[in-house]
């Protein structure tokens, strides 16, 4: 054993053992996450962020966060048709204690996708890159499965290669037609009832009967330059209170005062 003083014991233990433990949550604040006005439930949830300290601003830590929410929660309708679709919302601006979000993507849950794949049928899928009228570049994935005709006696319902190519071409054409003619808000409104997939299923019946046709995933590849006014319109604030306040301040308002009114004397200026 080494001879000499044990500095750690003489000082009462290891260095830093008496340091006070600070709860990290005391330095954080809660913010409300707000969904755009395309959805019925605007209050998505809450998120934590460190308070503004020095050069670290709290709003900068919130911007860019992605929240994944089930469509059933966004629409306040917990039915089976909505629960397996997940929407991604990205934080783009902070207004007071509200985090204003915008659409960032959509996908089906894994269990729904796995449950649709079965034997004795053909899986047909396609992906298309399309641009909306307001400059968003989206990659849209579509999936569908062949189904046995009611008059058929066969066990299987496999489509021929030429039929698969024809169906895939129809999928691509319908997706391009529906998305290139509208803005991002219109795309989301079409994704909510999945009207694009229903149009594809109806159009492909002449080639081969399909079922379980869905827009499987939507990715946002590119965005236009951030515009606060368009984001406020999505959240129902465009031309609202802020516009009224600015208009009133510019035009001036006549205020009734009692006779002999004198303004109060201020202690400091």
From Swiss-Prot:
Residues 1-20 are annotated as: Disordered. SMART domains: Ribosomal_S3Ae (SM01397). Pfam families: Ribosomal_S3Ae. GO terms for molecular function: structural constituent of ribosome. Its main location: cytoplasm. InterPro entries: Ribosomal_eS1 (IPR001593), Ribosomal_eS1_CS (IPR018281), Ribosomal_eS1_euk (IPR027500). It is found in: Cytoplasm. PROSITE patterns: RIBOSOMAL_S3AE (PS01191). Keywords: Cytoplasm, Ribonucleoprotein, Ribosomal protein. GO terms for biological process: translation. One of its GO terms (cellular component) is cytosolic small ribosomal subunit. Has an essential role in oogenesis. Belongs to the eukaryotic ribosomal protein eS1 family. Component of the small ribosomal subunit. Mature ribosomes consist of a small (40S) and a large (60S) subunit. The 40S subunit contains about 33 different proteins and 1 molecule of RNA (18S). The 60S subunit contains about 49 different proteins and 3 molecules of RNA (28S, 5.8S and 5S). This is Small ribosomal subunit protein eS1. It comes from Anopheles gambiae. The lineage of its organism: Eukaryota, Metazoa, Ecdysozoa, Arthropoda, Hexapoda. The gene is RpS3A.
């Amino acid at each position: 054993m080494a001879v000499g003083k044990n500095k750690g014991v003489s000082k009462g233990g290891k260095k830093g053992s008496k340091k006070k433990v600070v709860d990290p949550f005391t330095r954080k604040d809660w913010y409300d996450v707000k969904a755009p006005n395309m959805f019925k439930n605007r209050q998505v949830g809450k998120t934590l962020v460190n308070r503004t300290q020095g050069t670290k601003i709290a709003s900068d830590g919130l911007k860019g966060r992605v929240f994944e929410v089930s469509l059933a929660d966004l629409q306040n309708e917990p039915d089976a048709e909505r629960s397996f679709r997940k929407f991604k919302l990205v934080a783009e601006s902070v207004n007071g204690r509200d985090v204003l979000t915008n659409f960032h993507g959509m996908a089906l849950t894994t269990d729904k996708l796995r449950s649709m794949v079965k034997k004795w049928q053909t899986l047909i899928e396609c992906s298309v890159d399309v641009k909306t009228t307001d400059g968003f570049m989206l990659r849209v994935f579509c999936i569908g499965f062949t189904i046995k005709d009611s008059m058929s006696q066969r066990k299987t319902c496999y489509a021929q290669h030429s039929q698969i190519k024809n169906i895939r071409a129809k999928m691509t054409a319908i997706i391009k037609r529906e998305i290139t003619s509208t803005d991002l808000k219109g795309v989301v409104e079409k994704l909510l009832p999945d009207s694009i997939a229903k149009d594809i299923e109806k159009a492909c019946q002449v080639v081969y009967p399909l079922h379980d046709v869905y827009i499987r995933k939507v990715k946002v590849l590119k965005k236009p330059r951030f515009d606060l006014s368009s984001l406020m319109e999505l959240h129902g604030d465009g031309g609202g209170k802020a516009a009224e306040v600015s208009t009133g301040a510019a035009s001036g308002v006549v205020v009734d005062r009692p006779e002999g009114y004198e303004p109060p004397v201020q202690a400091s200026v």
